[in-house]
Amino acid sequence: MGRGPSIEGRKNASDAKRGKMFTKIIREISVAARAGGGDPSNNPRLRTAMDKGLSSNMSKDVMERAIKKSTGELEGVEYEEVRYEGYAPGGVAVIVDCLTDNRVRTVADVRHAFSKCGGNMGTEGSVAFMFKRLGVLSFAAGIDEDTLTDAAIDAGADDVVVYPEDGAIDVLTAPDAFAQVRDALVATGLEPAHAEITFRADNDIAVDGDTAVQVRKLLDMLEDLDDVQDVYSNVDQAALGA
């Protein structure tokens, strides 16, 4: 009779996932600090990365060390930002954002993933026009819709989207207004459950059958690469069982 994964096996998998998430956050903190300085009060990108670290139970000491390495107070690795674009099976557009200390390694890994899963890499700008860059502040069900909407508009948000299926609400902003809107909402006691600057597709593409399997395989493979920070696509997530 077969047995499921052991408790130790599940714990090891959970620890590995947590370690990968921490690595991504540390890299983002490092790049943000190098680009905009080590003071999160004057560096919205750094503050966003640190907020993500705190919500993931990362210690402040770990984050401070990452900042000091980036600002030259401690010796550390320098990472650069690179973005790759391409197509998954079914014409699904994919954007892959990376932070790397070895561009040659990273592009080889990303290209291998596309090739292995039946996709192909494109040139810069080949799919980015299908997406919008925007800030998203997500609020769980239970928050007063009118109060949040009024506060968001006053703070400079572009739109407020309510999801009737679960009552969740997203506040959408221009990227350069993200920090301003977030700070204004938090100051009034409206703390988002999640906040980030991201890409959203203008239109989703539905896939099914073997194509859906291959698209999911590619997205998962890209997400698992050490140098990959974020993966965006215009696939209809419902088609992937998400």
UniProtKB/Swiss-Prot annotation:
Cellular localisation: Cytoplasm
GO cellular component, one term: cytosol
Keyword entries, A-Z: Cytoplasm, DNA-binding, Transcription, Transcription regulation
Any GO BP annotation: regulation of DNA-templated transcription
Molecular-function GO terms, alphabetical: DNA binding
Record family assignment: Belongs to the TACO1 family.
Alphabetized HAMAP family for the sequence: Transcrip_reg_TACO1 (MF_00693)
PANTHER family named in the record: TRANSCRIPTIONAL REGULATORY PROTEIN YEBC-RELATED, TRANSLATIONAL ACTIVATOR OF CYTOCHROME C OXIDASE 1
Protein name (Swiss-Prot/TrEMBL): Probable transcriptional regulatory protein XAC3151
Source organism (scientific name): Xanthomonas axonopodis pv. citri (strain 306)
Taxonomic classification: Bacteria, Pseudomonadati, Pseudomonadota, Gammaproteobacteria, Lysobacterales
